UniProtKB/Swiss-Prot annotation:
Record text on cofactor binding: Binds 2 magnesium or manganese ions per subunit.
GO biological process: cell wall organization; peptidoglycan biosynthetic process; regulation of cell shape
Residues annotated for ATP binding in this entry: 184-239
Binding site for Mg(2+) 1: D310, E324
Primary role: Cell wall formation.
Broadest EC class assigned to this enzyme: ligase
Gene (UniProt): ddl
Record-annotated ATP-grasp domain positions: 148-357
Swiss-Prot/TrEMBL catalytic activity: 2 D-alanine + ATP = D-alanyl-D-alanine + ADP + phosphate + H(+)
One Pfam family of this chain: Dala_Dala_lig_N
Residues where Mg(2+) 2 binds: E324, N326
Pathway the protein acts in: Cell wall biogenesis; peptidoglycan biosynthesis
Protein known as: D-alanine--D-alanine ligase
Amino acid sequence: MSKLRVGLLFGGRSGEHEVSISSARAIASALSAGENASKYEILPFYIHKDGRWLAGEAPQQVLKSGAPLLESSNSSPADNNLVNSQQQTLERWQSPSQVAEVDVWFPILHGPNGEDGTIQGLLTLMQTPFVGSGVLGSALGMDKIAMKMAFEQAGLPQVKYKAVTRAQIWSNPCVFPKLCDEIEASLGYPCFVKPANLGSSVGISKVRSRQELEDALDNAANYDRRIIVEAGVVAREVECAVLGNDQPQASTVGEITFNSDFYDYETKYTAGKADLLIPAVIPDEISRQIQDMALQAFAAVDAAGLARVDFFYVEATGEVLINEINTLPGFTATSMYPQLWAYSGIPFPELVDKLVQLAIERHNPSH
């Protein structure tokens, strides 16, 4: 029986390029472990920070070193069939010949152009199965404003928020103060300012005063044209993993504890900065509620394959508020998603195997 050729797609043109490499290394290792070694052949594809797709030796080098390629010269023409970005657009989007050899794609591109529906649209056009959500689920899972609207429609409780645009923030001096007045009146302090379309806590600020609010809005506008401001809440941060397509399963619930002021990019991806507690020490009925809400959120955005759903548990009142869904969660050594499933009885190699099989199942539905 011939091996299934898995196109491991990583890197990308986003601020989470290095995170993508870390996830890809873990997945490549899992696809080569135990029984998976006899089932799968890995075809790695590395998307350079300049947007070029590289196959052959270049992605192997990145997987081995864990470091991104910094210079175009690091890859020879033999390893890269995609020409320079300075050349014609038509030529630039010629893909490496190995693309045609892929049986199923495993995109592990975090952030914009990776988990926002864009790469999912391309893979859909290729008519090849791929791991994870389709265009709609990915787009809703990436845009925090659209996501919250979907949650609201599904009746899921969440923190108060206000959506603003870059145009409002960078408008004339008369409009911006009024915008800040509205935010102060409706949300108060502390509150969180977030770019709508960036993952891994990039560009997020916790603000406690008018000056901090103004600075945070200006900073977030550098990252995105859509910004969301959320009311702060005193709560424990808990997470639940979801696995499946139309009949998904929810994992046990985990909790994130950290000493920093909030769960920012550095805290998330630096060993020792945050602790993952699995299972979370919370009442059983709260765990069941979180699992049920995670499945509702998964359906609300039309997710598929996998997702991690984040919640606030307000211990003082017993209230559970949904924070967000991540349709392509990290697969690094410190990532919550694979650890939640490991505790729930699905070790990492088996989890990766299930995700590949779910991709094929979704592409080829049967009665």
